[in-house]
């Protein structure tokens, strides 16, 4: 038997019975999660095939990345991970791959600064492995070695971007800017 003050007796297994119901039947608990993920845009160009498939030169690979988030409905945001990968050699362009991989994310009852961090750091971190696989498959299907992208530290990129923005605001304002809540 559990004693008074025991961890098991202190659990409120039926919060509705304790009068903790959300007002008007609305859930007021924080909620974050993906509804779905999808390829929004995919373009693969192999402009110099079939000659480029026989080039023995070491290509220069360029990767550009961008992250976007837009409101798609009440408490729903579309997060886009945009990746442009290209390979060039002295003989010409081997391939160009453009991918927009997106996800619909529910963000409910979360403070704005935490929601922003989730949409621009954590959600892209979750989407990236799927986008990485699509890029690798696309380059392989174009006749080249699969382009295996290294993991990306989206949290570090997010913090770096916040720091850059703060410095820009300080420079524009002539004084020290007060960081928003949640910025480090």
Where would I find each of the regions flagged by the language model?
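N-terminal intrinsically disordered, cationic/polar leader segments
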Residues: 2-126, 132-184
């Amino acid at each position: 038997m559990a004693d008074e003050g025991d961890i098991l007796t202190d659990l409120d297994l039926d919060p509705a019975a304790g009068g903790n119901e959300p007002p008007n039947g609305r859930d007021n608990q924080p909620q974050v999660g993906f509804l779905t993920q999808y390829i929004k845009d995919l373009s693969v160009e192999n402009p110099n095939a079939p000659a480029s498939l026989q080039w023995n030169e070491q290509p220069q690979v360029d990767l550009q990345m961008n992250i976007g988030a837009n409101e798609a409905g009440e408490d729903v945001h579309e997060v886009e991970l945009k990746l442009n990968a290209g390979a060039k050699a002295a003989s010409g362009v081997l391939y160009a791959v453009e991918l927009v991989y997106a996800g619909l994310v529910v963000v409910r009852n979360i403070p704005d600064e935490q929601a922003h961090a989730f949409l621009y750091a954590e959600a892209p971190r979750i989407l990236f492995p799927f986008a990485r696989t699509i890029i690798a498959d696309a380059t392989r299907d174009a006749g080249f070695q699969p382009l295996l992208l290294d993991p990306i530290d989206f949290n570090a990129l997010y913090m770096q971007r916040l720091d850059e923005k703060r410095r820009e605001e300080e420079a524009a304002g002539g004084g020290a800017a007060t960081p928003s809540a949640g910025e480090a």
